[in-house]
């Protein structure tokens, strides 16, 4: 496996941008994360990052899905995933340093949330594969978020680590479980 330094930086910066610009909006005057405004912000931010860093995945669901489908070698996929986590951790640490709340407990992984993550991952990968990472995929992320599909991102893990909530096993299982199930759906 050949190291792709530019690709590694793209994954980290993209994930950090999502963490800072979308999750960084948590304050008493910001729109709640389950609102259409935040879904739109997430979609636009992802679209811009995907267009800026062509070929980057940025979302662990896409990375896991591409590894499971055999489109990405496991070594490269693992490196992409780790760089996404690093970028999210750096972004969450900056937010925590500013005094922002960066940790929100994830809901327990239920059969319903697993099914929606599976279908959401499948649909997102369908759009991403056919149209590429761009405004179309970003707009579709917004639609999925407005519909209530949980797209556990590296930001969720970065916030958990930065706020010192790693001992909350229910949250950790919910975030990783949603990510893995979404990745399996993306591989279908």
Name each model-derived stretch.
Residues 1-188:
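Membrane-interface helix-loop junctions and terminal tails of multi-pass membrane proteins
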């Amino acid at each position: 496996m050949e190291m792709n330094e530019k690709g590694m930086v793209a994954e980290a910066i993209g994930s950090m941008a999502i963490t800072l610009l979308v999750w960084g909006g948590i304050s008493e005057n910001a729109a709640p994360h389950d609102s259409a405004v935040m879904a739109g912000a997430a979609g636009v931010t992802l679209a811009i990052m995907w267009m800026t860093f062509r070929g980057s995945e940025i979302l662990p669901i896409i990375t896991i899905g591409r590894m499971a489908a055999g489109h990405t070698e496991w070594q490269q996929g693992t490196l992409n995933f780790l760089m996404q986590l690093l970028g999210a951790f750096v972004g969450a640490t900056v937010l925590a340093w500013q005094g922002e709340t960066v940790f929100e407990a994830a809901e327990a992984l239920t059969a319903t949330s697993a099914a929606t993550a599976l279908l959401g991952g499948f649909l997102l990968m369908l759009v991403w594969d056919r149209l590429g990472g761009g405004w179309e995929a970003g707009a579709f992320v917004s639609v999925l978020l407005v519909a209530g599909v949980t797209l556990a991102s590296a930001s969720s893990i970065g916030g958990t680590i930065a706020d010192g909530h790693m001992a909350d096993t229910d949250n950790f299982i919910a975030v990783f479980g949603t990510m893995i199930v979404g990745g399996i759906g993306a591989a279908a």
